[in-house]
Amino acid sequence: MDSDTVTADISLSSFVYALLLLPFLLILKHIFLKPPPLPPGPYPWPIIGNLLQLGKNPHVKLASLAKLHGPLMSLRLGTQLMVVASSPAAALEVLKTHDRTLSGRYVSSSLSVKDPKLNHLSLAFAKECTNNWKNLRTICRTEMFSGKAMESHVELRERKVMELVEFLATKEGEVVKVMDLVFTTICNILSNTFFSMDLCDFEREGLKDFIYRAAELGATPNLSDFYPILDGLNLHGSKKKSKEALGRILATWEGTLKERRKQKNPGSSHRDLLEAFLEIRFEDDQINQVILELFSAGADTSTLTIEWAITQLIRNPDVMYKLRDELTKIIGESPVRESHLPHLPYLQACVKETLRLHPPAPLLLPHRAMETCQVMGYTIPKDSQVFVNIWAMGRDPKVWDDPLSFTPERFLDSKLEFKGNDFEYIPFGAGRRICPGMALGARQVPLVLATLVHLFDWSLPDNMDSAQIDMEEWLVITLRKENPLRLVPKVRK
Ligand code: HEM
């Protein structure tokens, strides 16, 4: 046998051995290199998964499910996978350690922008954190939320709040839907920052009702969110309804946009966001998209926080008394100014305590896994929806003493801030997707709240006692429409 034949025999036998070993190697790979499992969660039913388990207050139900399944759990909603983080440690993993991968946005099919050009120019609904999204955040920060921009709008915010006070004063003794009026004020603060004009009226319906309607449609789950294959069928007709509602919102500033495009020099006494957008040659569609998103993200969140703060103050007269006392000592008889806010620690603590118990976005906005990743020893597959249940974290007895009581004092000697670094307390989120409007929210909410508490006495109508305002989360919104929470403001003499 010559050496060539021996070499050929050896290679042939190595090949045969390798072939025989292959199944074993594959089995070993399967056993040892198997990706970690999905996060634990309730058993999913065939086809519907866990859809029926969420109910009408998903954050409340998810909080109780997390007690059974742990701080990182997964549920199936139709064909979609939902992952929920419910502890500060899990929130830190999602919003800091894996922020790059998990900062995609999951957008409901009824809200999703079909035009790819607009999708690239979206802020809250941008599916990825693209350069366009970064640029948009930078423009909004520079023009609206930076220290300089915030200072340039102080007088505007104070004026709008005084208009609310003047209107309320004309209603002495009457039953008033105060929170509708607060919503009007917040919308007008925003619309003046965008266009230097009011878009809402205390007496008439208009923009605010269209925004309610659009928000309601956006929050209503759509079957194609759970079964994307049904997307083209538009079973609820919700896309048509959202399009109508959005069309009516856009119509409220269409004329202004046209006018301002024609003007060479806008002539407004202070710069607004529209001026910045026109300078960088944004088209109408692009401007509409961003302003729409800023309205939807900024108006309801601030109003709900004020509404809950007032509700908690009525429920807790001692806290109301202490807050009034602080306001009287620091402000005296004059109207509240933004320059007073840094000197009102108890007011700031009341706002923080309200955001702990009643975060207006209890699950943040839905994030999306842009790639498959491993978190806390579990796999989160690409395109899963990822939520952080800050409502559950705000009421967790492992994190807070006596978590259900409204005790602003807990924030007085504490260094806890809502700026996205303390993961037990993130009402504005954290990481790349943190709320860009935090600076504005953190000024307009205490300004309006302090004004309402300082200038008015709050009492309930005779036929309602404080037990009746023992509301469940999100019921406030329902109350507003079906059985509005009517508080009687009495102007203090
Ligand atoms: C009390 C007031 C507010 C609270 C509690 C709040 C809270 C939040 C939260 C929790 C998020 C989602 C963060 C995430 O998904 O991780 C968010 C996003 C957002 N907020 Fe706010 N917000 C408030 C006021 C405002 C205001 C006044 C504006 C602007 C006018 C605003 C504009 C936005 C936008 C555009 C986003 C989407 C950001 C993105 O996806 O990149 N918010 N906010």
Task: Give the ranges of each region predicted by the language model.
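Cytochrome P450 substrate-recognition site 1
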Residues: 35-51, 60-156, 177, 182-189, ...
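Conserved cytochrome P450 K-helix E-x-x-R motif and the immediately C-terminal K′/meander segment
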Residues: 51-70, 251, 334-377, 387, ...
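Central I-helix of cytochrome P450 enzymes
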Residues: 186, 190, 194, 245-253, ...
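Conserved cytochrome P450 catalytic core segment spanning the I/J/K helices
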Residues: 145-149, 173, 187, 219-224, ...
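Cytochrome P450
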Residues: 2-22, 76-83, 148-159, 169-192, ...
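Cytochrome P450 heme-binding "Cys pocket" and the immediately downstream C-terminal segment
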Residues: 317-319, 386, 438-478
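Conserved cytochrome P450 K-helix/beta-meander segment immediately N-terminal to the heme-binding cysteine loop
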Residues: 388-417
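Cytochrome P450 heme-thiolate "Cys pocket" and heme-binding signature region
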Residues: 376, 414-445, 472-474
